[in-house]
Amino acid sequence: MNLFFKIIIIFFIITSVKANIVKNIQIQGNNRISDETIILFGEIKKNTKYSKSELNIILKKLYETDFFENVSISFENETIVVNVIENPIIEEIIFSGVKNKTILKTLRNRIQLKEKNSFVKSKVRKDENILTTILKKNGYYFSIIETSIKKNENNTV
């Protein structure tokens, strides 16, 4: 039992000590979002030691921006490499079937996805639920929400 605890303590010491010093920062895969913006939001700094847990924090911060569909970080020869796949930008949101301008305005204001912002797939289902709730509260009990997403060539929807 004592040996088990010693092994665990040694494991934690070894994993916490292993940190890499970043001399260079390389960003790959970005088109719309600048390297500087990614470095700023990830709070990545040169000449700083980064452990795996600190790299995970950087990943979390970058995902929280909703700018990226996928982010990965690797460490190669004192260079931190951040690979990103950007979320598309919402070009236009069209509501059809609702004639009441007040309800349309309410629908536009309440949804999470907005024009000229990043398109996040997980927010589509949430917005559908929000729309259904608003329509039911306004007497449209049998309304059907159909989402259609058209991808364009310039990484917009």
Describe these PLM feature segments.
Residues 20-157:
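Interaction-mediating elements
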Residues 2-10, 18:
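Sec-dependent signal peptide recognition
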